[in-house]
A protein has these predicted regions:
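Structural preference for solvent-exposed beta-strand-turn elements
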Residues: 1-235
Length: 235
């Protein structure tokens, strides 16, 4: 099959899809905040919805709106919860330490290939610091106990998602805590994204800004930025 490609410039306005990475983090911060948050998010996907559903299981009231989400923080943290992560590694790795910090007896449900994805060394560090983790079935993971204050350490060369989960968790623990990241840090920009989201909510106090918008996904926007460099006029 022969294809003919004719160069052409583009003009117009483009709405970039929202950053899934930031959406996860802002939903979590909003669920931990002191008052409701209007989260503007032009689009969603199954991973983001998994995080929202897990936060609902932890007591937050999250309402999908035409423009995004309205997040009402949990009035009371439940003693136990079932959290369906679907196939989202971010959801599992972010919320597992949070559940440990809150002292919730949590059962995480997993689908697809998520049960095969690694949790070490996060698993070992959480057990060292007070939690008990077990796999009752091939598709579920149980977390019980409560993380205690103290000095935490994690190998940064495995996954930045472990670090994000611990940053959230340690901000919730009463008492002096610290986190040492050893080795070469993997995907450092994602850690900075977590710190920026927490700063927007003034963590560890988690004061809601009221309204916030999920920024566009830069990896998706790169195509259009490249087009502008080649003569297109897109905004």
């Amino acid at each position: 099959m022969d294809l003919t490609i004719r160069p052409r410039t583009l003009r117009g306005d483009i709405t970039i899809i929202p950053s899934k990475s930031q959406a996860h983090r802002l939903l979590i911060c909003a669920a931990l905040a002191d008052r409701p948050t209007q989260l503007r998010c032009a689009d969603t996907n199954r991973d983001i919805e998994a995080t929202a559903e897990c936060l609902r299981a932890l007591g937050a009231d999250i309402i999908r709106t035409e423009t995004g989400y309205t997040v009402f923080p949990a009035a009371r943290v439940p003693e136990s919860a079932v959290l369906n992560c679907c196939e989202s590694g971010s959801t599992l790795r972010f919320l597992l330490p949070i559940v440990g910090a809150l002292g919730v007896d949590g059962v995480f449900q997993m689908e697809g290939r998520l049960p095969q994805r690694p949790l070490s060394p996060l698993w070992e560090e959480m057990e060292r610091m007070g939690c008990s983790l077990s796999r009752p079935t091939a598709t579920t993971l149980r977390c019980s106990g409560k993380l205690k204050p103290g000095s935490y350490s994690i190998d940064g060369s495995v996954s930045s998602q472990y670090i994000t989960g611990l940053l959230f968790a340690l901000s919730l623990i009463q008492g002096e805590t610290s986190l040492e990241i050893t080795g070469k840090t993997e995907s450092k920009p994602y850690i900075e994204l977590t710190k920026a989201a927490m700063a927007l909510f003034d963590a560890p106090h988690y004061r809601s800004p009221g309204h916030i918008e999920v920024e566009g996904d830069w990896s998706n926007g790169a195509f259009f930025l490249a087009a502008n460099e080649l003569g297109s006029e897109l905004s």
